[in-house]
């Protein structure tokens, strides 16, 4: 308790921490907690299980509590932040809501971007939330552009998310990254009219006065939101006319100029050039902290930690809420309406509640992105930037928004890029460094070569069910097609997985598969072996963990594995990310991950005190054709086995190349074993040692000692000689050097 109190942690939280048997803070906690309590933005990296969740949860709980306490007692901070700007008093393009290479003329209407590789966009200073409106855009050159409408939630890259509607010079309309043919192309000297009927939920365009017809039906979740005139440019110049000047092609059918919109229908932009300041009034659905996790399991895990840490925090009590998909939203909405202080959730459901106005971001003091590299790899970059843009940068009591980013590694380019965009002079706390394999882990590769191992030809139908990629191909033995070898690899990997379990008499292991379908097929194969979820204690008892399983089933399966009720957890990278499962003796990589960092995440989970962990990777010697869904359904009901470049949903997966990249990343050569998967064992100090990495480095103490032994002996002799000489000096017969 004293150790945490010395860092400034309040006594109530320190008491709860002590009950969890946390006598001393971990390294990441000792570094990060004081920084966050001090009000700074923090980027932290540490291994899973290092206390990273506590490192951000403890200070977040404390500051949220102190904020609520101050409000309860009527205390107010000194706000020196100026808000508002004269730029909002007229219709023009907003210099505070634009891309970095987007230029606006002194009149606020002439716009230009000369960036030839990237799109840069902008929105107007004002928007409208009711009525029928029109504005014109004149093209001054032959560059590329899209014009239209968007909400403040939208990306400045107009038409690439569900909050914006664009029409481009190539004759395409765009919404939510869906580009469809519409109208006709336009270029220099053309004038585009942009129409919106908010009451009836329609958007349309005209070219030089010619009506191009209906372009979009506005979705229900956007009908009550203010929309702003928007554009995005690539090496182009435009000029806007909101109605202060005469239109070249005046609108008909009741549409009026934006500049003539009544005051009751006009909404000023929140992007004013100075920091947004949150409302002083407390709203029940406006939390003080928002913690975003990449998976439901991790969100539940973090929420449980928050509950433990705040156990003794009272008067006022903190209210936390879990917001995740896959469960009924009704209960979550009820709790939101009753009031909430800390929200922990996953991006999908949080995005839904924000877009429908159910979750208010006006009071957020903390934005925490846990496992940020996982969030970015799942494609949530736009979501993160969007919600960060909606959160006021300064609270009503004058405190700045704090952003905390946690990641398994801070050396990812995407994480660095994100931090530069949304964080304010962050402090880096990197206790992980570059990826390396723990010395308690022995990892080996088993080559899967169907040209050498002909077992797959003799199995008939008694093999694992494959993913269906080759259902329409001729994969019968006797040919020499790439498809035949690919199917053979899938079959052999099922056999090698079973062989590895039997050979090493595995009592517990995590088995990583590439896709959810692969996980299901492996589980079914274990059932064929007599195991499965219902066979407790069987050699092949197993449970499955991936996002297609119901949340309750996932939670139950994870608990069963942790309690050793089943031997094997079959899962995907996404499902397993960040989950606190450690000390597992074995990991099997049925397929190598396509991101080399994930390889270290996977194998780092193995190892016990009594023995080293063993990670076995099955690596195909030939290319394997696998699913890579780019379709809107993300694989549900998809049977398009054509390659991605041909409009399909498959790719050729090159594990040999991936292995080379992993070895280069780790600067070591991974040992290879034969298909019988017999891994050489060495005896040392009564413990089983599965082997050593070929790279030189830590752990090779014996050789190091042998090298130093002669020098140590020489030092010992010199020390003895020096001490003997000193003693003799004190007792010389003539007593010239008498000691005192």
Curated annotation (Swiss-Prot):
The keyword Cell membrane does not apply. One of its GO terms (cellular component) is nucleus. It comes from the Eukaryota. It comes from Xenopus tropicalis. It catalyses: ATP + H2O = ADP + phosphate + H(+). ATP binds at residues 46-53. Acts as an ATP-dependent RNA helicase, able to unwind both RNA-RNA and RNA-DNA duplexes. Possesses 5' single-stranded RNA overhang nuclease activity. Acts as a positive regulator of transcription. May be involved in 3'-end cleavage and polyadenylation of pre-mRNAs. Binds DNA and RNA. Component of the tRNA-splicing ligase complex required to facilitate the enzymatic turnover of catalytic subunit rtcb. Binds (via helicase ATP-binding domain) on both short and long poly(I:C) dsRNA. Residues 1-448 are annotated as: Interaction with dsRNA. PROSITE patterns: B302_SPRY, HELICASE_ATP_BIND_1, HELICASE_CTER, Q_MOTIF. This is ATP-dependent RNA helicase DDX1. It is found in: Nucleus; Cytoplasm; Cytoplasmic granule; Cytoplasm, Cytosol. The keyword Ligase does not apply. Residues 2-428 form the Helicase ATP-binding domain. Pfam families: DEAD (PF00270), Helicase_C (PF00271), SPRY (PF00622). GO terms for molecular function: ATP binding; ATP hydrolysis activity; chromatin binding; DNA binding; DNA/RNA helicase activity; exonuclease activity; nuclease activity; poly(A) binding. Belongs to the DEAD box helicase family. DDX1 subfamily. Transmembrane segments: none annotated.
């Amino acid at each position: 308790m004293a150790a945490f109190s010395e860092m400034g942690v309040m006594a109530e939280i320190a008491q709860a921490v002590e009950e969890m048997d946390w006598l001393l803070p971990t390294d990441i906690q000792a570094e990060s907690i004081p920084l966050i309590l001090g009000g700074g933005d923090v980027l932290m990296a540490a291994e899973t299980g290092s206390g990273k969740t506590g490192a951000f949860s403890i200070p977040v709980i404390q500051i949220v509590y102190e904020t609520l306490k101050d409000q309860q007692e009527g205390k107010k901070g000194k706000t020196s932040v100026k808000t508002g700007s004269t730029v909002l008093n007229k219709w023009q393009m907003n210099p505070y809501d634009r891309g970095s290479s987007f230029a606006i003329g002194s009149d606020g209407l002439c716009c230009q971007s000369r960036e030839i590789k990237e799109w840069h966009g902008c929105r107007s200073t004002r928007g409208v939330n009711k009525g029928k409106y029109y504005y014109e855009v004149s093209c001054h050159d032959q560059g590329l552009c899209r014009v239209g409408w968007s909400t403040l939630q939208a990306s400045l890259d107009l038409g690439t998310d569900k909050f914006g509607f664009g029409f481009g010079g190539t004759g395409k309309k765009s919404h939510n990254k869906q580009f469809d043919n519409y109208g006709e192309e336009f270029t220099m000297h053309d004038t585009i009219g942009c129409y919106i009927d908010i009451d009836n939920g329609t958007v349309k365009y005209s070219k030089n006065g010619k009506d191009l017809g209906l372009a979009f039906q506005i979705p229900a979740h956007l009908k009550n939101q203010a929309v702003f005139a928007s554009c995005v440019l690539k090496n182009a110049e435009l000029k806007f006319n909101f109605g202060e000047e005469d239109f070249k092609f005046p609108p008909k059918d009741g549409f009026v100029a934006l500049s003539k919109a009544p005051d009751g229908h006009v909404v000023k932009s929140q992007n004013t050039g100075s920091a947004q300041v949150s409302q002083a009034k407390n709203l029940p659905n406006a939390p003080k902290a928002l913690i975003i996790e990449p998976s439901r399991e991790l969100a539940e895990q973090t929420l449980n930690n928050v509950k433990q840490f705040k156990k003794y925090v009272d008067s006022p009590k903190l209210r936390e809420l879990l917001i995740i998909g896959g469960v009924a939203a009704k209960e979550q909405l009820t709790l939101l309406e009753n009031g909430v202080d800390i929200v922990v959730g996953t991006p999908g459901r949080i995005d839904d509640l924000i877009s429908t106005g159910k979750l208010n971001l006006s009071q957020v003091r903390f934005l925490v992105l846990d496992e940020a590299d996982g969030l970015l790899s799942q494609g949530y970059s736009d979501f993160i930037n969007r919600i960060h843009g909606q959160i006021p940068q300064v609270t009503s009591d004058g405190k700045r928004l704090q952003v905390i980013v946690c990641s398994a590694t801070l050396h990812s380019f995407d994480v660095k890029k994100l931090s530069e965009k949304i964080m304010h002079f962050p402090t880096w706390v990197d206790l992980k460094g570059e990826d390396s394999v723990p010395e308690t882990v022995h990892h080996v590769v088993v080559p899967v070569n169907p040209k050498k191992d002909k077992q797959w030809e003799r199995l008939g139908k008694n093999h694992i069910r494959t993913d269906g990629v080759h259902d329409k191909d001729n994969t019968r033995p006797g040919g020499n097609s790439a498809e035949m070898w690919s199917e053979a690899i899938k079959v052999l990997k099922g056999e090698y997985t079973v062989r590895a379990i039997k050979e090493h008499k595995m009592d517990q292991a995590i088995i990583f598969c590439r896709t959810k379908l692969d996980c299901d097929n492996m589980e079914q194969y274990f059932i064929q072996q007599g195991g499965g979820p219902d066979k407790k204690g069987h050699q092949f008892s197993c449970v499955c963990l991936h996002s297609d399983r119901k949340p309750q089933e996932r939670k139950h399966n994870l608990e069963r594995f942790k309690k050793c009720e089943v031997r094997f957890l079959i899962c995907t990278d996404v499902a397993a990310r960040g989950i606190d499962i450690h000390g597992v003796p074995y990991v099997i990589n049925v397929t190598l991950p396509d991101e080399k960092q994930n390889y270290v995440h996977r194998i780092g989970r193995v190892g016990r005190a009594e023995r080293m962990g063993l990670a076995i990777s099955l690596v195909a010697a030939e290319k394997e054709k696998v699913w890579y869904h780019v379709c809107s359904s993300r694989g549900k009901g998809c049977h398009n086995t054509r390659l991605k470049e041909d409009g399909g949903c498959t790719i050729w997966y090159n594990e040999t190349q991936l292995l080379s990249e992993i070895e280069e990343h780790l600067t070591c050569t991974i040992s290879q074993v034969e298909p019988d998967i017999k891994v050489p064992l060495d005896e040392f100090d009564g413990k089983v040692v599965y082997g050593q990495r070929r790279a030189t480095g830590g752990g090779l103490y014996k050789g190091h000692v042998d090298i130093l032994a002669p020098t140590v002996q020489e030092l010992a002799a010199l020390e003895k000689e020096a001490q003997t000489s000193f003693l003799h000096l004190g007792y010389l017969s003539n007593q010239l050097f008498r000691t005192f």
